[in-house]
Amino acid sequence: ASDVYKRQPYNQAVTDGTKIPVPINVGTSVDYMWGKSTNQVSVIETDARIPMKHALSQFVVRLKVSPEYHNDGNLTSAKLKATGAKFATTGTMNLNDGGKITFQPTSTELTWSPNTTVPAQGQQAVDYAAAIYPMTLAAGEVSLEVVIDGATYTYAIPQITWEAGKRYIYSITMRSNDAEIGGENGQSVTI
């Protein structure tokens, strides 16, 4: 009897389940999936039951407008900026260690160019999502910087652990003279 593992997307060239390449493409929110059989597979028990899990975290910028906001509401840039090397776009996943991803931090920024327009007042909020490696952030270590209608807004992200398989939503409500950002803990800050 043995365990059976599965990973998506599948890459035929990968032969070592402890070092599966998991690159992040900052242009998409593509996640990687992995799973381990919940039953032992053998000659007698040939069906493997494999529940799948997400390998990455999802970072979401949610855009809304208040009634007094009258600009176009165009989000042209979103950045995560760290005080030291915190980010990477290449890492590996270890199936024998619960799908844990390891990476060597090489960059102080992750930058996206979403070109997303904030919806008109009364419309649903618009989400811009990006896949990121799971990690723990200390208070003040990372900030979110967005450019909306040419104005730059910066928000210091409080201490948090971005876990695999979870979404971390940062809501931005555009108002006439400023923006309000709400983070993971539900508290909002005017920027």
What label would you give each PLM region?
Residues 153-160:
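Edge beta-strands of extracellular beta-sandwich domains
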Residues 137-141:
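Extracellular Ig-like/FN3 beta-sandwich strand-entry sites
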Residues 68-105:
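Short, ordered, surface-exposed loop/turn motifs in non-cytosolic proteins
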